UniProtKB/Swiss-Prot annotation:
Protein name, as recorded: Putative F-box/FBD/LRR-repeat protein At3g56780
Superkingdom assignment: Eukaryota
Organism name: Arabidopsis thaliana (Mouse-ear cress)
Record domain FBD: where: 391-423
Annotated LRR repeat ranges: 56-82, 88-113, 135-161, 162-187, 209-236, 237-262, 264-285, 357-382
Domain F-box residues, every copy: 6-62
PANTHER family: EMB|CAB62440.1-RELATED (PTHR31900:SF34), F-BOX/RNI SUPERFAMILY PROTEIN-RELATED (PTHR31900)
SUPFAM superfamilies in the cross-refs: F-box domain, RNI-like
UniProt keyword list: Leucine-rich repeat, Repeat
InterPro entries attached to this UniProt entry: F-box-like_dom_sf, F-box_AtFBL13-like, F-box_dom, FBD, FBL13/AtMIF1-like, LRR_dom_sf, LRR_FXL15/At3g58940/PEG3-like, LRR_PRU1-like
């Protein structure tokens, strides 16, 4: 770095420098202390600390030292990510240090601990200033069963792939988050427990549940109404009850983004309610979807939603790859019927995104292009770069959209191999 550049940076206000450093990992932020006397202590006032712990000894010592050196009255966010090699590391002491040393202003705590056993101190669940709490890992535990939970400021709670103590403690934790707006609970596929009633939380705006038994207790006598809920994602539910889910959907007046498994999505086809704000629908399928199956899903749901959801524009079909990891197969955007000469289902589709993962995907692409006569934007993504496409025979008919309406083509993961070249040359020379 030249003296001129250093001089220009030094002239910036401290608040602006601290803001810039907040977007950089803590490892690199601490290095700035070598620039000058001014920078020697400047890093200790950065409000956000981000640690990516991949080394057993050296990085642990660095984290310990930097966490204690940081000025306690300004730390607002702590993010610790553990690599898979640290499967036996207990990061509880680091969390306790953050809570005790920086308790006054800690607003965000995120633990991304893959396949580790982590002991969480009970003080974590009585932090008055905590707004965001995200826990991700296989085994997360507390030193003792929860008896007291007081998180009055908590707005966002994510529990992702975590075996989090016992169900009673989990219920206590969730039931004492009275002002939460963003809730995500994802359990591993082999862990199911009693249904969890979400109807108590009237402030929810985003809800994602996976691996539970149900979303609303059948025995619940409370009125089911989530007046602010905009995003709902429900998947891998054991003994899912359509009646309880209907109660929920019928009382989410501003719902705009909905994700369901195919086996439970039939409730939409049989539910006669108005969903005036619904714009996005994602269906998760566990089968190797072919063109016929894709067309059937699109036709059924777009026709139904055209009646009950006048704002509906985005439809996607996803495939369950493994655990709770999904990859999309097809995403489409529908045009406004009043602006199209033909308002039929497939002619409304103006934007198509397709995941290319096999010859099956290429055949599906051809079938979709033949049906989507008004397509304007086409985006392709090659998911498996190590699986080249074989040679394929181009269709005898040229899709109408390639000759008239298609304006934009984007292809991510293009490999330049034979199958890709065949597909590219055939598509482009016709467009």
């Amino acid at each position: 770095m030249t003296k001129k550049v250093c001089s220009c940076i030094n002239e910036l206000p401290d608040d602006l420098i601290l803001k810039i450093l907040s977007f950089v990992s803590t490892k690199h932020v601490v290095v700035t202390s070598l620039l000058s006397k001014k920078w020697k202590s400047l890093w200790t006032r950065v409000p956000i600390l981000k640690y990516d712990v991949r080394d057993h000894t050296r990085f642990e010592r660095f984290l310990d030292k930097s966490l204690f050196s940081h000025q306690s009255h300004v730390l607002e966010s702590l993010h610790v990510e553990l690599s898979v090699t640290l499967w036996n590391k207990d990061i509880g002491p680091w969390i306790r240090t953050a809570l005790h040393h920086h308790h006054c202003h800690l607003r965000e705590l995120e633990i991304d601990a893959c396949i580790v056993h982590t002991v969480l101190p009970p003080e974590l669940f009585t932090c008055k200033t905590l707004v965001v709490l995200k826990l991700k890992g296989i085994v997360i535990d507390v030193e003792a069963p929860l008896t007291t939970v007081s998180l009055p400021s908590l707005k966002t709670l994510h529990i992702d792939h975590s075996s989090l103590f016992d169900f009673g403690s989990l219920q206590m934790l969730l039931s004492n988050c009275n002002f939460i707006t963003d809730l995500m609970v994802i359990r591993e596929s082999r862990f199911f427990f009693a249904e969890y009633d979400v109807s108590w939380c009237k402030t929810l705006m985003a809800l994602k549940l996976e691996g539970l038994k149900d979303v609303i207790s059948i025995s619940s006598s409370s009125a089911v109404c989530l007046p602010l809920l905009k995003t709902l994602h429900v998947a891998r539910m054991e003994d899912f009850n359509n009646d309880s889910f209907c109660r929920l959907l019928s009382n989410c007046p501003v719902l705009s983004d909905l994700t369901l498994e195919e086996k439970t999505s039939d409730v939409l086809l049989n539910l006669d309610i108005d969903m005036p704000y619904l714009q996005r629908l994602s269906i998760i399928t566990r089968v190797d979807a072919d063109s016929k199956h894709i067309f059937s899903l699109m036709k059924n749901y777009t026709r139904k939603l055209a009646i009950i959801a006048p704002s509906f524009k985005y439809f996607s079909i996803q495939e369950l790859a493994y655990a709770s990891r999904y990859r999309y197969i097809v995403r489409v955007r529908l045009g406004v019927p009043s602006k199209l000469e033909d308002a039929s289902t497939f002619s409304r589709i103006v934007h198509l995104e397709l995941s290319i993962c096999s010859e099956r995907s290429v055949e599906m692409l051809v079938d979709l292009l033949l049906c989507f006569t008004k397509l304007v934007v086409l985006k392709l993504e090659h998911v498996y770069l190590l699986t080249p496409l074989g040679r394929w025979e181009p269709p005898s008919l040229v899709p109408e959209c390639l000759l008239s309406s298609l304006e934009a083509l984007e292809w991510k993961g293009y490999t330049g191999r034979y199958g890709d070249k065949d597909l590219r040359s055939n598509r482009l020379k016709r467009t």
